[in-house]
Regions:
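Residue-level detector of well-ordered alpha-helical segments, enriched
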Residues: 18-23, 73, 103, 130
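Non-catalytic cell-wall polysaccharide-engagement segments
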Residues: 83-177
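Solvent-exposed, non-transmembrane amphipathic alpha-helical segments
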Residues: 26, 43-47, 150, 154
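Short acidic/histidine-centered micro-motifs embedded in hydrophobic/aromatic stretches
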Residues: 25-29, 40, 133, 137
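Peptidoglycan-targeting cell-wall enzymes and recognition modules
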Residues: 1-5, 31-122
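Export/targeting segments at the very N-terminus of extracytoplasmic proteins
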Residues: 1-33
C-alpha cells in the first residue's frame, strides 16, 4: 500500500487531509510506514526479521506476540493490551497482523477511544497542532521534546504536500501557538 493509498484510506475513514498526514507522519517516524516492521532492537533478541516475525505470529508458531514487549507495525504498538487488540482485530478481519489496510482500520478503531485525538484529526487545519496532540495523547513516546515535535510535524507536512499536491508551508511548525 503506497503512502498516497494510506492517505486516501484515512481521509475516506473520516480524517481531514491534515489529520491523515499527521497520523502518517507519526507512523513514518515509528516504522517508516512499514506495516510489518518489528522494532529493530528486538530482531536479534527474538531471532526474527520483520517478515519471519509476521509470518510466525500469523501461523501460530510464535505465541508471545502480545507480551514480548517488541514494537510492531505502523504505530509500533508495544503495550501488551494494544498488541492483543491488534492481533484480535486482524484475526476477526481474517487478515495478517502485517496487513497495512487492517492496521489503518485498527488505528481508526483504536483512536475512537481517544476523543480529543480523533476530533483533532477529523478537524485539523494545522499540522503542528494536531501532531502535538497525537504525540502527547496517542503515541506517547518517552521523548516528547521540542525537537521530536518539530521532526514529527515535519514528516506530516511533507506527507501532506506530497499527497495533496500542494506545497503548503506550515507557519507554526517550529512553535506551538
Amino acid at each position: 500500500m503506497t503512502e498516497k493509498q494510506m492517505f486516501d484510506f484515512l481521509v475516506a475513514g473520516g480524517l481531514s487531509e491534515h489529520g491523515a498526514a499527521v497520523l502518517l507522519g507519526h507512523f513514518q517516524a515509528e516504522s517508516g510506514l512499514n506495516s510489518r516492521n518489528l522494532q529493530n532492537s528486538f530482531q536479534k533478541k527474538l531471532g526474527h526479521t520483520d517478515d519471519s516475525y509476521t509470518e510466525a505470529v500469523d501461523n501460530g508458531t510464535y505465541s508471545n506476540f502480545d507480551r514480548d514487549g517488541a514494537g510492531y507495525g505502523l504505530a509500533q504498538w508495544t503495550y501488551w493490551s494494544r498488541k492483543a487488540n491488534l492481533r484480535n482485530f486482524a484475526e476477526q478481519a481474517g487478515k495478517s497482523i502485517g496487513d497495512p489496510e487492517m492496521q489503518l482500520s485498527f488505528a481508526l478503531h483504536e483512536l475512537s477511544g481517544y476523543k480529543t485525538v480523533i476530533q483533532a484529526l477529523k478537524t485539523a487545519t494545522s499540522i503542528r497542532e494536531a501532531s502535538d496532540i497525537v504525540l502527547e495523547q496517542y503515541e506517547k513516546p518517552a521523548d516528547q521534546s521540542e525537537e521530536v515535535k518539530v521532526k514529527r510535524a515535519g514528516y506530516g507536512q511533507e506527507i501532506y504536500n506530497r499527497c495533496t499536491g500542494r506545497n503548503e508551508e506550515e507557519k507554526e511548525l517550529n512553535t506551538r501557538s
